[in-house]
Amino acid sequence: MAALADAHLQEQIDKAYQKSKKTTNVKLMVGFNRRFAPHIIKMKDLLANHLSPKSILMTVNAGAIPAEHWVHDAQVGGGRIIGEGCHFIDLMRHLVGHKIVDFKATKMGNAPGVDVTQDKVSITLSFADGSFGTILYLANGGSLFPKERIEVFCD
């Protein structure tokens, strides 16, 4: 797999920007793409008439990655929560539609035989409208369990 060099990426961004100046109604989407998935759009539509606070549970069965992999290096990959978990935080914020006002995060404690604990976390977010949600980002789940699951409860 080839990696994009910074210069090449900047060139592509510049081309897209120049093209967008010539064309009307151009949308540029970067990074947080889960909110544009058809099921999420449908979910957002179904929630539109529910103005009461929401309770959300997201389970991410991320799968194990060896401890020596670059994604676990804070200087290179940033860790799995920075690199991937942030997408679920964005998705939850999108579904609630209000600012995050507080959070609590807990990682798995150190235990014999557990090489990486930072990829087994619970993140609870509190929102300005009273909603809350918990993201279970887990690298120790079974492969038969779905990779991503979202449950939303509201009146």
Language-model regions, residue ranges each:
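Contiguous beta-strand/loop segments that form the cofactor/metal-binding neighborhood of enzyme cores
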Residues: 83, 90-155
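Generic recognition of short, well-ordered alpha-helical segments
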Residues: 8, 41-42, 118, 147
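Predominantly a Rossmann-like dinucleotide-binding segment in NAD(P)-dependent oxidoreductases
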Residues: 26-29, 34-114
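Residues that form or flank phosphate/diphosphate-binding pockets in enzymes
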Residues: 4-5, 38, 144-145
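Beta-strand-loop-alpha-helix segment that lines the small-molecule cofactor/substrate pocket
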Residues: 1-32
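Glycine-/small-residue-rich active-site loops that bind phosphorylated ligands and cofactors
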Residues: 2, 35, 140
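Short helix-capping segments at alpha-helix termini
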Residues: 19-25, 49, 125-128
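Hydrophobic packing residues within well-ordered alpha-helices of enzyme cores
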Residues: 9-16, 40-43, 135
